Every structure is written in structure tokens, then in C-alpha cells.
């Protein structure tokens, strides 16, 4: 394993390790109570396992996901990737990095969620993002060689001290309405992993990793695949350690019901409160500055990776508009949405993610299956269409816009996983239909 692989792996870790990766694990730990392990393992599965798979699958075709999705349908490829890039880009994920940075660096100092302070902070934040992203060829070096080691050192310092401070406590009772059995806790942890957005971000980051590997002089698809896999494993191991550590500490932190109600009444995110408490308990007044460094680095690296990925994709499909113009447009969009506040951004993203995630997971698994089992285009199209339609109606029913009894009666509906058995059945149906349709098996392009 050479130095370039380590740098690419650390860069991938830093791009994945953003806002959600900090605030969701301790919150999950607090809520899961006595059922911490099934919850955190499921969270790791969707928060790390699926993203790792997503990055690796993107290296199966020399054109990445663009080429692989074109095998399903060229029109679907464009539509799906536009939705993916906007979701992980200026509509939700990038604004969340800015609003999380504000809540965890500025709010503890000024003791207020001032809209004016948020406005000023996001201006400075996105100016820094703009500077880094205007030259994407240096992104890997700037993040992997400089920012990631600094991020790892600071996060490790906080985790070790917080573990010593709180590991002696027993686990709290948690949210017993959601976490009341091993299965319910696993299902809840699985769906909570959606909120990191990493499984769909992997589709974008895969292209950055593959291009970075190619820049090292590797051109053969099988070698690119191996290097991408190795870099992905480096990122995954680091993320697993941090997720479980933050979750375990959150699980053992004493937080009263009165305090939780107070946080909710002031529209404070509970995950950010837990992290702030970890830092201040371990390092006193210096703790909030240490945490500020961690958050700023984590969110900044993710925002830069996303801006570059989104801008490069849109420049590719609309070459008449320059890459730099897209960078400016998406940063402006992110700035506007970030000023709605962290909780508002998270709330807005949940319905969209509930539609996009099942389709994204289905697509990634179908591409992987097609690598090893002869698969026709119709075989992939059927489950994708069915899961997409089901996800839309599931969200409509869950929001109460229209109660759909059929949706509510599906297996695993209570855990928001009703799409999974349907996806399996639809895939089997796709293979059966494929027997009667004259199409050549899908073959992914090699160098």
C-alpha cells in the first residue's frame, strides 16, 4: 500500500465525516438506552457499510456511475444523478455542514441562535469553501495531507477524554417508544443511518476517488477497483471507530428529561448538546474551542468534497456553463438554505431522503449483482421503478397527505423498511421477466 492510497483513503474519510457523522451517533446512543449495540451496528451498516459499497461499485465501470446507470436507462441516469447531486449538495447536505458548524462553534460562545450571527458566520464559511473548491485538482492534497490528520488528532483527543469521563456510568433508559427490542432498535438504527446521507454521497465521492486513483498513473479498471477498495476500507475503519465511540459515550451520558425538554423548547439540536457537553466536561472552557476545531474541519472537508463533486457533474452535463460558475451558484444556494437553521435543514431533508435512499440502495445492489450474474436491462428497470413509486407513496402516507392502507399494511412498515422486501420481490420478478425479453446481458465498460 503506497502513500497515495493512504492520502486518498484519508481524503474519503474526511469527505464522509461531516455534520451528520458528528451529531447523529451520540444522539442515537442516548436514545437507544439498553439496546445500544443493535442500534449502533445497524447505524454503522447504513452509515458506513452502504457508503463503502457505493464507492466500490462506482469503480466497476470506467465511466463510473454515469456509465453504470446508463445501462438501466440514459434518461434515468441523468434524472437520478441530478436528484442525488442536488440532495447531497446545495439543497440539504452542504447547508447542513454550515449550520452544524455554527451551532457547535459559535452558539456555545454567544449562547444564542442569533440569525444575524448565523448570517455572518455562513458568509465567512462559504468564502473559505469557495477558495478551496476553485482549484479542484488540489482538493486531495489539501484535505488528505493537511486537514484530515489535524481532524483525526482533535477528534481522538476528545473521544479518549470523554470515554474516561463517562464510561463508568450505566446506560440511560433511552427512548423506549422507539427502542424497545433488539429488532426495533436495529430497524431504528438502520433508518437513522439514512440521515448521514453518506450512502448517496458515495455515488458522488466515488467519482472523485476514481479520478484521484487515475491521477496516480493507474489506468486499468481492475487496478482502479483494487485501489478504490483499499482507500474505502481505510475510510471505513476510521469511521467505524469514531461512530461507535461517540455513540457509546452518548449512551452513558446522564441527561435528565428536564434538560431534554429545555433543549427542545429552545430548538437546540440534542446531538450538538451532547458533543458540547463531552468537550466541556473533559477540557473545561477550552473544550468548546477544541470542539469548534473538530466541527469546522469535519464540516469544511465535507462541504468542499460535495461542492467539487456536484459542480463537476453539472459542468459535465452542461459544458457551456463553466465549473467555476457552478461552484458559485451552488455555494450561493447552500448559503441561503443554511440560514434556515440546523433543525429546519434536517426536517426538510427527511422526506426527500426517504424517497432517494431506497432507490439509491437498490441501484447500487443491482449494479453489484449484474457484475456477477448475467442481468438484462429490464431486470434492473423493474425493481428501480417499483421501489421509486413505492417510496413516493410511502412518504405521502407517512406525512398524512393521503392515508394509503396498502402501504401501511406492508411488512416492516413500522420500521420504515417496507421497501426492502418489495425490492427483493421486484428483483426476482425482473429476472423472471428477463427470461422472455430479448436483450443482451449488461456488461460494464473496462479500460
Swiss-Prot record:
Q: Which UniProt keywords apply?
A: Amino-acid transport, Cell membrane, Membrane, Transmembrane, Transmembrane helix, Transport
Q: Where in the cell is it found?
A: Cell membrane
Q: Which GO terms describe its cellular component?
A: plasma membrane
Lineage: superkingdom: Bacteria
Pfam families with a match to the protein in the record: Branch_AA_trans (PF05525)
Q: Where are the transmembrane segments?
A: 6-26, 40-60, 74-94, 114-134, 143-163, 193-213, 229-249, 290-310, 326-346, 350-370, 382-402, 417-437
Q: Does the keyword Transport apply?
A: yes
Q: According to Swiss-Prot or TrEMBL, what is its membrane topology? A: Multi-pass membrane protein
**Which molecular-function annotation in GO is an example for this chain?**
L-leucine transmembrane transporter activity
Q: Which GO terms describe its biological process?
A: isoleucine transport; L-leucine transport
Family, per the entry? Belongs to the branched chain amino acid transporter family.
This molecule's function is given as: Component of the transport system for branched-chain amino acids (leucine, isoleucine and valine), which is coupled to a proton motive force (Potential). Contributes to NaCl tolerance.
Protein name in the entry = Putative branched-chain amino acid carrier protein SAR1419
Organism name: Staphylococcus aureus (strain MRSA252)
